[in-house]
Each structure stands twice: as structure tokens, then as C-alpha cells.
Amino acid sequence: GDIIRYTPGVNTSQGEGHRDAVVFRGVRSTADFFQDGARDDVQYYRSLYNIEQVEILRGPNALLFGRGGTGGALNRVTKKPRLGVDSRKASIGVDTFGAFDIEADLNMDMGDDMAFRLNLHSDSLKNHRDFYDGDRLGFNPTLRTKLSSATTLDLSYEYIDHERFIDRGIPTANNKPVEEFAEIVFGDKDNNVHTVEASVFRAMVSHVFSETRKGNLSITSNSFEKMYQNTYAASH
């Protein structure tokens, strides 16, 4: 949210309670997402627990790589193991509605040419809206090894398990939200459901040719199982 909020020309839009939806320079997209440069266009909410930085490109995608939308693209760069470093970090967050979030980031040095990193998170979703709840789990182990002084291999696996209540918001009248219904959900608590389970394998070989040139080869294998159903009020 904050990443997009403070990026000029980029806004969020309604993702119908189950997916990221970004507006690049007035063009709405649910598919122009990338992870480590590889396309990630499955419709779901992406977590940032294992993300080092987010890159946002604005302008026609065809100018860069041929396929995609006309407004721009969003690329998430994942955290990689750091050679020669041992570190551990954990955080816990709670709010007044009873929601909580737990994250951990472990980096382990395994010798001069190898390191291992594990990122994991678990959160429980709650807010002021009727029936709203959800649970999300994710973990991402990554192994890095130096094949030579200029070549590095990263092997990564990520597992995602996400279930949440679908809240499509409140109805409108005269092109405005009906504020009196701020806490009321116009839906079916047993029918408004979204689930996604995913396994993502990634392999990346990076090579430094010179001080000004480097290249990488990435291979990704993804398996997603998603279910989405809901009822909602269109108007009042």
C-alpha cells in the first residue's frame, strides 16, 4: 500500500477482495506483476515478507520486453542469502481488532562459497467489518552457492497458503459510498470465500562479465490452486 501510495502516477484499485490491482498512469492491471524479473500474473494478494525491494516501471511494457500492458509493471526482488553473514530477525505485530502478524528472517553462513536464508510469515486478518477474517502462511528457503569467482547459483522454493473472507465493500448511492453501512457486509459469510495454495520453484544463475556488464538466467516452475466465490450488493 505505502509503496504505491508514494509513487507518482501509480494508484491502487479494487481487487474484489482477493487480488492485487494497480493503476499505472490511468491504466488498470491485475497481470503486470513480476518477481525477480519473471512474470507473476496469477491473481492473488502478494505478501512482502520475503521482498528486498519493489521496482515500479511506468510506460508501455513493449518498450522493454514486448508483452504486457500499456501503463507499466511492478517487479518484486526477493531476499537472497548473504555469503559470510549470520543474522536472525523476527517481528510480531498486533492491532486492536485482534489481527496479528509474525515474521522471521534467518541468514546462515555455510562456508566461503555457500549461504542459506529462510523467510517465513504467518498472519491472521481481522477488522471492524462484519464476518471479516482470514489466515495467511508463507515460507521461502533459499540456497546460494558460488560456482566461481564471477558466477552465483540461487535455488529457491516458496510455499503460500492463504484463506480469507471476501469483502467487496459497501454499496453506493449518488456515486458516493453509503457511510451508514461502514461496518455492514452485504454478502454471505459462508459463500464469500477466497483460497489460494501455491508452490513456486526458482533457479537463477548470475554471472559478472565485467564491471559494467552482467547477466542472469532464471527458471521458474509454479503451481497455483485458487478458489474464489462471492455475493455482493451492486447498488442501494
Predicted regions and their residues:
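Short intrinsically disordered, low-complexity coil segments enriched in acidic
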Residues: 1-7, 119, 192-193, 236
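Acidic, small-polar-rich N-terminal luminal/periplasmic segments of exported/outer-membrane proteins
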Residues: 1-85
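Residue-level recognition of beta-strand termini and adjacent short loop/turns
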Residues: 4, 16, 111, 146-148, ...
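Glycine-rich, histidine-containing beta strand-loop boundary motifs that form or position
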Residues: 16, 35, 58, 120, ...
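Residue-level marker for the onset of beta-strands and adjacent loop->beta junctions
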Residues: 18-20, 29, 102, 127, ...
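Structured loops at beta-to-helix junctions and adjacent beta-edge loops in soluble globular domains
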Residues: 25-27, 79, 93, 158, ...
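Outer-membrane beta-barrel translocator/receptor signature
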Residues: 49-52, 63-141, 147-153
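Acidic/polar loop-and-plug regions of large Gram-negative outer-membrane beta-barrel proteins
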Residues: 123, 127, 140-208, 212-236
